[in-house]
Design a protein with these regions (language model features):
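Conserved ABC ATPase "signature" region
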Residues: 112-128
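Helix-to-loop junction immediately C-terminal to a conserved catalytic motif
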Residues: 53
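A short, flexible loop at the N-terminus of ABC-type nucleotide-binding domains that lies
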Residues: 1-32
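Q-loop/switch helix immediately C-terminal to the Walker
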Residues: 87-109, 114
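Conserved ABC transporter NBD signature motif
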Residues: 58-72, 76-77
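Hydrophobic anchor residue at the start of the ABC signature
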Residues: 145
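Walker B catalytic motif
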Residues: 160-161
Length: 211
């Protein structure tokens, strides 16, 4: 991809877990549309999303999202990113409806009609007044996906979105991703071990298994 057309540019990214290197001088350009990050369980997919979300600090390298360089303006960078780790316990005590109601203040391009559509499509209305700790794995991911798609964030990061989903929800998810991927100013980065049917993947980033 021509760097001039990339929404996200990553240069020389380096990161290690204690005693275990994960990325060494890794570079990539991500444009508008859907990008698949694929690899096995130990390939660093989730770690990469956390690095792109500025949740983990790299030991070297730079990230530029639009005109914003993470190292120069970390808060401005993070305001352009949607990332919610489905495995994190940090949201357990929150009520779904209250969490969703707080998101428009964080995302300037928040799309309320889109959220309403996704709440219907994922059949989430019975769960809006529950705490996140009460949600099944699949329902939790559906809530996060509805918010991610409605966020309007230039960089939207999603980790293993189909875990725990039934077939109808997977079909809806794939159609919603395909529709959202048409936006000319959004990069949807999805980490999964294989491509999802019906999603027009603009690019595929394959991560090797870590030794």
């Amino acid at each position: 991809m021509n760097n001039a057309s990339a929404l996200l540019q990553v240069q020389g990214l380096t990161f290690s877990h204690p005693g275990r290197p994960v990325f060494l001088d890794w570079s990539a350009s991500v444009g508008a549309g859907a990008t698949l990050v694929c690899g096995g369980e130990s390939s660093g997919k989730t770690t990469l999303l956390r690095l792109l979300a500025a949740e983990l600090p790299p030991s070297a390298g730079s990230l530029r999202l639009g005109q914003v360089v993470l190292a120069d303006a970390p808060q401005a960078y993070r305001r352009q990113v949607f990332w919610a780790d489905p495995r994190s316990p940090a949201m357990d005590a929150l009520i779904v409806r209250a969490w969703l109601q707080g998101l428009p203040a964080q995302y300037s391009e928040w799309n309320a009609p889109a959220l309403a559509t996704h709440l219907d499509g994922f059949d989430l209305h019975p769960h809006l007044d529950k705490g996140f700790y009460m949600l099944s794995t699949g329902t939790r991911r559906k809530v996060l996906m509805a918010a991610a798609l409605a966020s309007g964030a230039p960089l939207t990061l999603t980790d293993e979105p189909v875990a725990g989903l039934d077939r109808a929800s997977i079909r809806y998810l794939c159609q919603a991703l395909a529709d959202t991927a048409q936006a000319p100013d959004r990069a949807l980065v999805v980490a999964h071990y294989e491509a999802l049917d019906g999603v027009p993947w603009r690019a595929v980033i394959e991560l090797p298994e870590l030794d």
